A protein has these predicted regions:
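Conserved glycine-rich cofactor-binding loop
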Residues: 12-13
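Active-site helix of classical SDR
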Residues: 116, 152
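Residue(s) in the substrate-gating loop at a strand-loop-helix junction
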Residues: 136
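Conserved glycine-rich Rossmann-like NAD(P)H-binding loop of the short-chain dehydrogenase/reductase
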Residues: 26-43
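The beta1-alpha1 cofactor-binding region of Rossmann-like NAD(H)/NADP(H)-dependent oxidoreductases
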Residues: 56-66, 98
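SDR active-site lid
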Residues: 169-233
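Substrate-binding pocket helix/loop in short-chain dehydrogenase/reductase
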Residues: 92-103
């Protein structure tokens, strides 16, 4: 990863933050994106290589072409795009406002594919690149109280499995990561059925693996060029 440019969304905390610090320790240039610029600055201070902070809201997709241009102006290439940003949900389907379903699809699906489509021409011109999308076990199996989240993650998987087949001829690799329970703030930041913050750390999340362990599993999977990368405890076996 020496001198490679790696763009990570959702980089202000959790898995994204751990990935940024890990890849920096391996010599990569790091582009940090999320909505929280203050937290991104803290992450940048923990990176030992060149960084670029690009504040990004996955719901504001019109900003993505300009953001991509800024990355290319700074680092010339985009070698890896890690689609990690997103939001979860904790509510029964019958108690979830349709606006919440739409918002999760807007951020997790449309936001992710819009940024990918902004970056793809750069990788195509380079004739190389690797796109890694952090899905979830909920992208493989439906999960209690996560109907909207699972639907968006299933959509992600369908898109990126198709993209892998299309971009193989351009020497662009596509990997999908399926984390199990990782101790991050995803459940606290998840939306309730009304769209308010859930604000509670799930028991399974609390007992999950560390973001650092998950980041190492992802790095190993990328090095092995795996199409599917799994990380977690007994739930992934």
């Amino acid at each position: 990863f020496e001198n490679k440019t790696i763009w990570i969304t959702g980089a202000s905390s959790g898995i994204g933050k751990a990935l940024a610090i890990k890849f920096s320790s391996l010599g990569a240039n790091i582009v940090l994106s999320s909505r929280n610029e203050d937290e991104l600055l803290k992450v940048a201070n923990q990176c030992s290589t060149a960084t670029l902070i690009i504040p990004l809201d996955l719901a504001k997709q019109d900003d993505f072409p300009e953001a991509t241009k800024k990355v290319c102006e700074k680092f010339k290439t985009i070698d890896y795009l890690i689609n990690n940003g997103g939001i979860s949900q904790r509510s029964r389907a019958t108690e979830t406002n349709l606006e919440v379903d739409r918002l999760l699809m807007e951020i997790n699906y449309f936001g992710t594919i819009a940024l990918t489509k902004a970056v793809l021409p750069v990788m195509q011109n380079q004739q190389r690149g690797h796109i890694i999308t952090i899905s979830s076990l909920s992208g493989k199996f439906g999960f209690f109280l996560r109907s909207a989240y699972a639907a968006a993650k299933f959509a992600q998987v369908g898109f990126f499995e198709s993209l892998r087949l299309e971009e193989e001829r351009n020497n662009i690799n596509v990997s999908i990561v399926f984390p199990g329970f990782v101790k991050t703030n995803i459940s606290q930041n998840a939306l309730s059925g009304s769209g308010k913050k859930h604000g509670v750390l799930d028991n399974n999340q609390d007992k999950g693996i560390s973001p650092d362990k998950c980041a190492q599993d992802i790095v190993n999977g990328i090095l092995d060029n795996k199409h599917e990368i799994y990380s977690g405890g007994k739930e992934i076996w």
